């Protein structure tokens, strides 16, 4: 089916399904509240924050094009636009992989790939939310061009695919992992649907060459155009912790993901594994090689999302785990493709269409339930973040109102530094996701908790809190050095705590706030 016909036939889904993605994440992205590192992005010049040494050349380029490191209104609008582009590009990529599968199923699968709790943590860093999603859009678009090369052998779409993939790699470090899952998923679907071995051979060779060329191009661009830092090398733990320790971390991480032993994951992964396992037994082919390739592809979809953990030898930051929902979607995509293949009879099209119609309704209900497995924990995280923002705003207004009575306004010539001792943890109601022992996810932290125990104690958290106040329009002088922190910690021990009277005191060199 040509894109024009596909567009006309599926217009209602093209317009409506992205609204689900937008509704889930927009409360996080489209607001002016504080998030960690926002002050560094807004205050950065030239290279923009530390993105240059991270090799995020495309992200820097996109910020240059928009003429601002961060504007919350612009970021929100861009996120809406890119959500439409990304979900529809992913749906069309899946449609090209198996055009016989009902497009309603494909649109739900696209939603499963793009709605997941780990995306909430990623989009908490809202100053790059639209750009990260745009990177995924580039991968989907690249995949569309790649399928044209696989089917028709055209060279120009292949070149475009390499360029788009390279640009995507320059946005965020998780993009190669997502692409790996997408290509393994594509190959898995072709194992199920391709009638000729030639297509499988072309797909394998084309995908490998494209991935290698894109990876090399990204490496060369990063090496020659970006400042070389130690951010990624510092995260490799194999030489620092030893093989046995690293393996234990990887096993623990796999267990956490598989059993959803964290609010950042769902049971959708294990459900998808079970369904794919059943489909594998249903799948039948006299071609032994095709069966072997199918088994290897499924194994690849299981392992690929853990690529960052395997390379680093440690449990990665949750916000980098963006490949897992794509793996879930493609495992389910395989299962539906197998069922469609077994129920459809080439020699009796009418009978096959009747059987397919029943299968479609069953598939829609089943996929909707899997989508709900991703949607419910994601919405809990979004709700929790909303409540944290409300709580922070109330504290900021109260404390900032009291601080105005002291000599610490940022625009005063003789202003004293503000030092804030203590934290204000967020507890929330029964619906909120509770922080747990060892919580690393920023989305669960109040602005009054960030970096509190990073040495020197309360120095960095003070600057975080004052930056959060700036997002609400309150500007107080930040401490640039930590010389007074020890003295402030000692004095705070004898002071009342917020919100009791006397929780703020002015001393010779600073104004002290005791939380």
Question: PLM features: residue spans?
Answer:
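Transmembrane catalytic cores of multi-pass membrane glycosyltransferases
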Residues: 22-79, 83, 87-89, 110, ...
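Transmembrane-helix signature of polytopic, membrane-embedded enzymes
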Residues: 94-118, 137, 155-156
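Intrinsically disordered, polar/acidic, low-complexity terminal segments
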Residues: 2-53, 57-58, 63-87, 92-107, ...
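Hydrophobic membrane-insertion alpha-helices, especially the h-region
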Residues: 364-375
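Well-ordered mid-protein domain cores that form the structural environment of catalytic cofactors
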Residues: 109-124, 129-147
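Alpha-helical transmembrane segments of multi-pass integral membrane proteins
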Residues: 135, 315-343
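Specific aromatic-rich, kink-prone transmembrane helix
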Residues: 133-151, 160-165, 182-192, 327
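Membrane-interface junctions at the ends of membrane-embedded or membrane-associated helices
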Residues: 1-5, 97, 146-159, 188-202, ...
């Amino acid at each position: 089916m040509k894109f024009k016909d596909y567009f006309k036939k599926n217009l209602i889904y093209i317009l409506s399904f992205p609204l689900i993605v937008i509704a889930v994440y927009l409360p996080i992205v489209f607001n002016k509240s504080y998030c960690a590192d926002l002050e560094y992005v807004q205050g950065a010049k030239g290279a923009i924050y530390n993105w240059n040494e991270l090799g995020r050349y495309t992200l820097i380029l996109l910020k240059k094009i928009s003429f601002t490191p961060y504007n919350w209104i612009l970021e929100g609008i861009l996120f809406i636009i890119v959500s439409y582009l990304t979900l529809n590009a992913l749906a069309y990529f899946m449609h090209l992989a198996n055009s016989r599968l009902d497009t309603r199923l494909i649109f739900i699968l696209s939603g499963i790939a793009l709605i997941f709790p780990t995306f909430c943590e990623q989009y908490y860093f809202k100053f790059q939310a639209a750009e990260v999603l745009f990177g995924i859009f580039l991968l989907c678009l690249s995949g569309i061009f790649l399928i044209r090369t696989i089917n028709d052998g055209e060279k120009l779409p292949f070149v475009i695919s390499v360029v788009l993939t390279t640009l995507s790699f320059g946005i965020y470090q998780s993009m190669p992992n997502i692409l790996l899952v997408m290509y393994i998923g594509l190959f898995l679907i072709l194992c199920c649907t391709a009638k000729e071995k030639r297509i499988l051979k072309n797909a394998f060779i084309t995908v490998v060459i494209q991935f290698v060329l894109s990876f090399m191009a990204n490496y060369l661009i990063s090496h020659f155009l970006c400042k070389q830092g130690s951010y990624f090398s510092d995260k490799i733990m194999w030489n620092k912790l030893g093989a046995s320790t690293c393996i234990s971390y990887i096993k623990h991480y796999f267990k956490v993901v598989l059993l959803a032993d964290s609010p950042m994951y769902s049971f959708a992964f294990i459900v998808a594994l079970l369904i794919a396992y059943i489909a594998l037994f249903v799948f039948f082919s006299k071609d032994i090689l095709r069966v072997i390739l199918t088994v290897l592809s499924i194994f690849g979809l299981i392992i690929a999302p853990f690529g960052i953990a395997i390379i680093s030898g440690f449990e990665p930051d949750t916000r980098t785990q963006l490949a897992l929902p794509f793996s879930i979607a493609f495992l389910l995509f395989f299962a539906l493709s197998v069922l469609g293949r077994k129920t459809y009879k080439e020699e009796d099209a009418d009978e096959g269409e009747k059987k397919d119609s029943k299968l479609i309704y069953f598939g829609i209900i089943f996929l909707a339930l899997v989508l709900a497995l991703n949607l419910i924990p994601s919405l809990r995280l979004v709700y929790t973040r909303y409540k944290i923002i409300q709580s922070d705003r109330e504290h900021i207004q109260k404390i900032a109102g009291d601080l105005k009575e002291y000599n610490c306004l940022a625009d005063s010539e003789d202003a004293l530094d503000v030092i804030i001792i203590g934290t204000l943890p967020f507890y929330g109601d029964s619906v909120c996701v509770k922080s747990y022992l060892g919580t690393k996810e920023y989305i669960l932290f109040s602005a009054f908790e960030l970096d509190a125990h990073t040495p020197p104690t309360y120095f960095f958290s003070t600057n975080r809190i004052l930056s959060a106040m700036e997002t609400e329009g309150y500007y107080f002088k930040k401490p640039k050095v930590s010389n007074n922190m020890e003295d402030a910690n000692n004095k705070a021990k004898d002071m009342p705590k917020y919100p009791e009277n006397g929780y703020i005191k002015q001393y010779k060199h600073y104004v002290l706030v005791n939380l």
